[in-house]
């Protein structure tokens, strides 16, 4: 088995910024891991968090350090013991899941012992700010099922 590994960074602006008690973000820097095998590509991504000692460079280095093993066919089970939990392992794990599903090796519903997925309600977080701005955000997102 031969796989190709690609690691890239992307930067996405956050419209209006996003604020929580720890600070404000104006953009998201994302590390993307892509595994290509027999014309099929699996993709995973992560956001390194300084709070956990992660940087863009440290995450890229951690993923690239697994390059030879991933190219040789490392699977998800091996990955769990080969890399510590964190952003880098998350990106690689997601890429492996995506690759296996797209290659037809896995049916996620069957694998998880579940029926076909159903829509799931999630919360939309209103960015911390001035009361008027928060009220406007809430009004703009009033059709969402759950605001926090």
Locate the predicted segments by residue:
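N-terminal capping/lid subdomain adjacent to the active-site entrance of alpha/beta enzymes
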Residues: 1-148
């Amino acid at each position: 088995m031969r796989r190709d590994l690609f690691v890239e960074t992307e930067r996405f602006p956050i419209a209006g910024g996003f604020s929580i008690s720890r600070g404000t973000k104006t953009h998201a820097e994302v590390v993307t891991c892509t595994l290509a095998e027999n014309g099929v590509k699996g993709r995973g991504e992560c956001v390194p968090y300084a709070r956990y000692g992660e940087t863009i460079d440290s995450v890229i280095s951690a993923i690239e350090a697994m390059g030879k093993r991933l190219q040789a066919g490392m699977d998800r089970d091996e990955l769990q013991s080969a890399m510590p939990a964190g952003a880098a392992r998350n990106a690689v794990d997601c890429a492996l899941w995506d690759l296996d599903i797209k290659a037809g090796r896995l049916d996620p519903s069957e694998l998880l012992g579940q029926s076909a997925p159903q829509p799931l309600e999630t919360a939309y977080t209103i960015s911390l700010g001035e009361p008027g701005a928060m009220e406007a955000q809430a009004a703009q997102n009033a059709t969402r099922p759950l605001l926090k």
